Amino acid sequence: LKNGKYKNFDLTLDLRTTPGGKGAVWFHTDPNLKKGYRIAINNDRADKVWWKMTGSLVSVRNLTKSFVKEDQWFKMDIRVAGQEIDVNINGEPVVEYIQPTAPYRTDANTYALLSEGTFGIESDGSGEIQIKNITVNVIDESTIDINAQLAEANDEQNDEIIKLHQSDFPVLDYHVHLKGGLTKEVAAKQSRKTGINYTIAPNCGIGFPITNDQQVMDYLNEMRSQPFILGMQAEGREWITTFSPETLKEFDYV
C-alpha cells in the first residue's frame, strides 16, 4: 500500500458506517486526493444527497440505493483492470464501467480518470467509517485485453446519461416492471451498463401477482440483494385494506 503506484488491482475491504458516517475510497489518486476515482461510502437513507450511495463510482455511475444499512459490516470489492472498473458490495455487482478513449468530464471532474497511484480513505460525515481486513492483489496487465474493453465502452461524447452524472443530477427510472423476460438480474446488468438507476415496482392487489403481506415480504427479501429502489404499484381500490400498514412501510414508496 505504500508504493503509491497501483494501476491494475483487486482491492477488498470490510467497512461499517456509524450513523451519519460517509465518505469514499479513492484509487489512482495522490496524497492530496486531487486525481483519480472515488467509490462512495454512504448508507444514510435520510441523506439529502440520496443519489451517491455506497458503491457509487462518483459522478460516473452514481447509485440511488444502498442495500447496506448503517451499523452493518459489509464487504466492498474494487477491481481495476485496464479500462474497466468493477465494484461489488457483499459479492453483488453494482458498477461495471469501462472508461472509453474519449471520456466525458466536466471541469470539476477533469482529473477523474484512470492512471495509477495510491489509495485513500476520505471521511466527510458526522459519524465514523470503520475499516478492517484490507487486501490488495496486483493484476498482471499482460492478461488484460484493453482493445476488447474499448470495443464495449459507451461513446460518452454522445451519451446524455454520463452528462447528467457529471452534472450531479440524479439518474433514475421510477417505473420499471419485471415482465416480458426482464428479470432482476437482466435489469441490474442493464442498469450497470447504461448508468440508469431503476425503481422496480411490482403490481400489488386483488387479481395481481402480489395479493397479501407474505407475498410482499417474500418479494422484498428476494430483491434486497440488488441496488434498486423498491416501489409498490397499488392496484384497485382494495389495496389499502389488502396490505397492512406495517408491510406498506417496507417499500421505499407506494
Residues of each region from the PLM?
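Short hydrophobic/aromatic-rich motifs at helix boundaries and adjacent loops
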Residues: P103-Y104, N158-I161, S191-K193
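N-terminal low-complexity, Pro/Thr/Ser-rich intrinsically disordered segments
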Residues: A153-P170
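Structural motif
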Residues: G4, V68, S126, L164-Q166, ...
